[in-house]
Amino acid sequence: TEFFRELPGIALIFILAAFYMLSAETMFKIGAVIMLCGMGMHALLPPTKVLAILAICVYSIGEHIQLAMKSTLSLQYAREGRGGAAQGFQSSTNQIGTLIGYLIIIAAFTLLDNQPYTMFFGLAAVLAAVSMFCSFKLVGKSETDSTKRRFYFHKKYTKYYMLEMFYGARKQVFLTFGPY
C-alpha cells in the first residue's frame, strides 16, 4: 500500500499544474475537503483491500495538496523577516501533534481488548472536518511573486530543513513497518 499512498505525491505535480490559477488558500481548502473524503471513506466503507487502497489514495491526494501549500502559507502569513521561524513553528507543532496522536493510538490499542479501528477512523474524520472548517477561515488570496526566487536554501533555515527530513524519514519508517 506504500506505493498507492505515495502515488498521489507524484500526481500532485499534475494536479497543481492543472489548478495553477488558484490561490494557495484555495488549494489548501481543496486539500482539506479531499482529506476529509478519504478519512470518511476509511470510517464508513467496509475494509476490503480495494476500498482501503482507494481511501488511502483519496486521503493522500488531499494530504499532499496540503503539504505543498503549508510552507507557502506559513511564509505568506509570517511577519516580515520571520518566514523561517514561522515554518519551523508550523513544522514542530505538526511533529508534536503527530507524536501525541501516535502515543494515543499505541495506548488505546494496548489497553483495549478489541481493536476499535472504525471508531478511530470516525474520530479522525471528525477531526478532519474540524480542520476543514478551520481552513475555510483563510481569506487571503495569495499570488505568485515572479520577482522572487522559487527555492530558498539558507543556513539560517537549517533547523527547518532538518525537521522536514526527520518528518519524512519517520513517516516512511512508520508507514513501511507500522503494519507489521
For every predicted segment, state its role:
Residues 65-78:
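Intracellular juxtamembrane helix-capping segments at the cytosolic ends
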Residues 38-39, 49-66:
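Hydrophobic core of transmembrane alpha-helices in multi-pass small-molecule transporters
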Residues 13, 33-47, 110:
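C-terminal ends and interior cores of transmembrane alpha-helices
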Residues 137-169:
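Juxtamembrane intracellular "pre-TM" segments in multi-pass secondary transporters
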